[in-house]
Amino acid sequence: MTNPMMSVSSLLTSGQQKVPMVPSPFGPPIVDRDVLSSSIAPTDPSQFCVPSQFGSSGLPNANMPNPLSSHFYSGWGILPPEPIKAVTTRNEMFERHHAARAEMEMYSLYQQRRMERVNPKGLSGLGIPLFYGSSCLGGPTGFQGRSTLPASDVHLHRSTFRHLQGNPILLATRPHFTECWGQKYRLRRGAVYQKPPESDTESFKSQAEEKSSSQMPTLSYEEEEYIKDPDIEVDNQQKPRVADGKPTTVPANPHGELHTHQRKPSSLEANAWDDGKGKPSEQVYEGCDGKNGVFRPVSILPLSGTHEQVALRENCSLSDIQKWTVDDVYNFIRSLPGCSDYAQVFKDHAIDGETLPLLTEQHLRGTMGLKLGPALKIQSQVSQHVGNMFCKKLPSLPTHARQAFDQPADTSPLLDMSSWSDGLSIPGPQDLLSPKRTEQDVMRN
C-alpha cells in the first residue's frame, strides 16, 4: 500500500486533465515537474524545490534563484497565480478607501465636539429654529445651503428674537447674522401678531430719520412712536390719553438720558481722584463722551491717592500706550503701589510701550522675577489702559446700539452684535420698550 504522505498528485498531463488531490499538511508540498515550464523548472532534479506554505525554503543550490517565491504565491489552484504587484496595488486601494472613510467620520465627530464646546446644551438649547441658509453658515457641513423651513412659515416670538443677538454660538458663526434676520423679520406670527412687524419697520425708518437729521431732541420717544405708527395709535385709542396740553413726564430723549447717565459716573469718578483739580478728569473722559462715541470707559481703579499718580494718569490716558518710551514705562511702574521696587527691572529689560502690553504672567514672574501680586497689578493696569485707548479710537455707534449699551442685559456688551450691522437690520426698540410703554400708559390713566 502506498503511503499517502509520499504520493504525487499530477495536475495536468500531456493530453488529459485530472482533479488535483489535497496535499497533506504533515509534509512538504510536492508538485509534478510536468506542470512547470522548462524555463522555470530546472532540468536537474536535485535543484528542484517548491517554497513551503509556512515560510520560504532555501534552495539546495545557492546560485539558483527561487523564481516561485518572488513572482508567485506558494500553493496550488486552478486559476493562474496572481503577481504580488497587483495584490499590493489592490490592497493600497482598499487602505486608501478605508482611510478616507475614517477621516470623514473623524471630521464629523470633530464638528460635533466643536459645537458641543461652544454650546454645551446642544443645538436644542438655543430655543429657536435653526436655519442653514446660504447667508447663515452656522449649521453642520452636510446641511449648508439648505433651509429647514421656508421663511414664510416661521413663527418667531419677540423674546426669542431679543435673545438672538447675544447668543454665543451665533456670535461664533458669523458677525452679520442679524443682517439676514433683519431682512427676514417680516414673518408670519399668527392671527394676533400680523401688524407689529410693519410697525417695527416703520420704527426702524423713524430711527434712521432721527439719526440723519438729529434735530428732534424735544420730542419724547413715546410721542414720536405714536406719530410715526398709525397701527399702534389705532390699538391704543381704547385707552384715554391725557397728554394733550400737558408736558409728559417721560425723559426728553432716551439718547439724551444716555448722555446724562454716562456723564454722571465719569464726574463721580473724576471727583474721586482729581483732588480739587478739574482738568485731569475732564481730559480723561474727553474721548469717551457722546461726541466721539458712547463707549462706557473702563474706569481705572485708584490704588493710591497721591498727586504723582494723578499727574501720571493725566499724561498716560491721553497718549497712546504704544508711544510710551522706556522712561514712561519706568515712571508708570514706579507709580503703582507695591511695584516701585520692580521699576528698574523694566528699565533694564528695555520695556517700552509696544512691548508692555505683550508681557504675560510667565514673562513677569519667570523672566523678570516679579512676585504674583505686583505682576497681577501691572497686568490689570496695562489692560485698563489698552481698553481706554480702544474706546477712544472706535467710531461712534448708531442710536439703537447706544440704547442697547445703556440697558441692563444678561449678556455683556462685547456679545452685543448690534454694532456690526446697519440700523435697518436690527430689531427696533419698540420690542424692547413695549412693557415700559404699557406701564407708562397705565400710570397716565
UniProtKB/Swiss-Prot annotation:
Disruption phenotype: Samd7 knockout mice show decreased expression of multiple rod genes in the retina, ectopic expression of nonrod genes including S-opsin in rod photoreceptor cells and impaired rod photoreceptor sensitivity. Show an up-regulation and down-regulation of cone and rod genes, respectively in the retina. Double Samd7 and Samd11 knockout mice show shortened and disorganized photoreceptor outer segments, reduced light sensitivity and delayed signal transmission from rods to rod bipolar cells at low flash luminescence. Residues 324-378 form the SAM domain. Expressed in the retina and the pineal gland. In the retina, it is predominantly expressed in the outer nuclear layer and developing rod photoreceptors. SUPFAM superfamilies: SAM/Pointed domain. Residues 227-244, 434-445 have a biased composition (Basic and acidic residues). Its main location: nucleus. Induction: Transcriptionally regulated by CRX. One of its GO terms (molecular function) is DNA-binding transcription repressor activity, RNA polymerase II-specific. CDD domains: SAM_Samd7_11. It is found in: Nucleus; Cytoplasm. GO terms for biological process: negative regulation of gene expression; negative regulation of gene expression, epigenetic; retinal rod cell development. Residues 193-282, 425-445 are annotated as: Disordered. The keyword Aminoacyl-tRNA synthetase does not apply. Residues 98-172 are annotated as: Required for localization to nuclear polycomb bodies. Component of a Polycomb group (PcG) multiprotein PRC1-like complex, essential for establishing rod photoreceptor cell identity and function by silencing nonrod gene expression in developing rod photoreceptor cells. Via its association with the PRC1-like complex, promotes epigenetic repressive marks H3K27me3 and H2AK119ub marks in nonrod genes, silencing their transcription. Represses Crx-controlled photoreceptor-specific gene expression. The SAM domain mediates its oligomerization and localization to nuclear polycomb bodies. This is Sterile alpha motif domain-containing protein 7. The lineage of its organism: Eukaryota, Metazoa, Chordata, Craniata, Vertebrata.
